[in-house]
Amino acid sequence: MIDKQFEKEEFKKSVKENVKFLYRKTLEEATQEQIFQAVSYTVKDVIIDNWLKSQKAYEKQDPKIVYYMSMEFLMGRALGNNLINLGAYGEVKEALEELGLDINCIEDQEPDPALGNGGLGRLAACFLDSLATLNYCAYGCGIRYRYGMFKQEIRDGYQVEAPDNWLKNGYPFELRRPEYAKEVHFGGYVRVEWDPVKNENKFIHEGYQAVKAVPYDMPITGYNNDVVNTLRIWDAEPIVDFNLDSFDKGDYHNAVEQENLARTIVEVLYPNDNHMAGKELRLKQQYFFVSASLQAAIAKYKKTHDDITKLHEKVVFQMNDTHPTVAVAELMRILIDEEGLGWDQAWDITTKCCAYTNHTIMSEALEKWPIELFSRLLPRVYQIIEEINRRFILEIQQKYPGNFEKIKKMAIIYDGQVKMAHLAIVAGYSVNGVARLHTEILKNQELKDFYEMMPEKFNNKTNGITQRRFLAHGNPLLADWVTDKIGPDWITDLSQLSKLKVYADDEKALQEFMTIKFKNKERLAKYILEHNGVEVDPHSIFDIQVKRLHEYKRQLLNILHVIYLYNQIKAHPEMDFYPRTFIFGAKASAAYARAKKIIKLINCVADVVNNDASINGKLKVVFIENYRVSNAEIIFAAADVSEQISTASKEASGTGNMKFMLNGAPTLGTMDGANVEIVQEVGEENAFIFGMSSDQIINYENNGGYDPDFIYNTDPEIRQVLMQLINGTFSSDTEMFRDIYNSLLDKRNMPRPDQYFILGDFRSYAEAQKRVEATYKDEKRWAKMALLNTACSGKFTSDRTIQEYVDDIWHLDKVIVKKN
């Protein structure tokens, strides 16, 4: 394993000893889960050697460190990924086989760490992988959620949220670090007293509730370079564990009250915020991990540096979306109240340390907090934001005298709310979007006033994915084929994939490529049969949409089109129709009623379609339960068609589109997010583009003129599909999908009916689907298209994205960890 010559016998001995010492069992007596733990601890031993070596190298070379602060880190399983990065996957597989063990069965015992939900968290995970692989010193900073967002179960077609108890057996790839615990303070009040020495007011936070933040460190291995960075996730514990006096008096509730209050902070990701208690808990979570992370970063800096005013030379805090943006004010608080700096000096440091990534143009996702809540929960931090806001308004007035509209649009505090994105933009030295189109929309639409005032801050960093997880680990058959054709350098230089273009007209290579695709489809079909009880034909077109469930992502457009196809087959049973399998995977937020109803609709349509013998299996619909990284790897490898059908202008980037492309699935999509750049790389002839442009959508939104009612009244096939939502075709309860029907047509629907232009794009989408079918029937043409998607995906590696962050924003130096 990289550091020391891998000895199979030594590895096997270590696994057996771990089983004995951990469980007092022999290997033959141990359960699969116990064997997973034993194997993981054996691998972790090697990782820890490299981890220590990396820390020594960092201490010696004193590099600038990026702290990547994110509410989510969707890591996926660690065992297989670490083995690939250590260069030991094949050897460990052989060693386990010699012990009579199957590495795939062992990997399946590992829970997906429930530290994230969607693209935001998976991007953060890919970035950590690339930072380590590219030899940069980085810490991920987040929360150690006990139950994640939720484990999705489908019961009677409905999403049911269950706790995702990923820690129930302990997690071998983490280390508790109580020696680095920090205190985080909530509530209380601020007392002001005069400091005669400094001749200024001194602010003292008193009467607060204190919570202990205890870090757990996870190793992040670089590929084939011995670098191990750290993901530090914070657990919340009470300052005093247990009130024995209360317990002895029979007051059992009070005995554990402090523990319960602390634990609540880290129970779940994104607690329901439809009520004030939920809003307060979310703000608590955000401040909790940000404050602990900043305290830890500054303590680490001060161990080897005396001058706090040079913090920005060695530290950068990258705020991943608006969740961690309270970091701006918390850093100011630490520098002023704890380090004794004046306002101007603290502001100068803060504005050189903090950078902000915007991930959305959806206004509801640009967080705003009620002043009453914020000032009560974080009184000193709120005072600092008030002062930042006061000074910023003066800047606006100087630049735009008398323009009160500018103040209204740009103020950090306005109309009873604290606007976190505005705080991040004002204080951050860099503001980046995550795809070219997204960044242009930010500059010209959503954040136009800020861009006009401070254009130098704005830049684009198109997202990327790590090929080490989503090809090397997720699709080993294709990975081996690629290596056989062009060598292994693609694992750290994805631009090498362009060398595959020479095989685009090579019939033998195309046949090999499609044989691998078919084997991966068989693997997914087996998974579906085991988990859904539905038999799907791997010879059919696997048309897949897997992503967070949101109306703008338009899973509804997809399932309405499935209904349309079903109607076509029923009306014309003799028609030449190539068999299709439509596969969905998505979690809906627990409080998002319409999104959950769309899941129910998909499952109701599946029940009808899959059980209709008259269509001879030409059409199948599958909803994969509990979509997550571990089943995503199986899904991406098996896809024929990548559904990327968001309303143009709404998707910031997307990264699922890149994972599908890397695995040889052409994009069926709108010109939105990173789809635009995918088409630029692969050519429009190797994708299936449909729908209105972002300019057309924005024009309709700003000026009106879109009339879904007209479409409904003039297109009988669309009308039939919509009527089937409410006439009992898919549910005996004709009101079951009334809300979905009304959302598309009822003029009382706010802000307008069919907010995401589903009916407006329906015909264009249906035509694109016809092109998919026609192309797929031409086997050679389809194979060439699929191969070219893989060959042209080199741009979309997170290695490229991270290098752009390093060059343009972070300015880090590489650190070399010497191999033994």
Annotated model-derived regions:
Residues 1-820:
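A conserved ligand/cofactor-binding region detector
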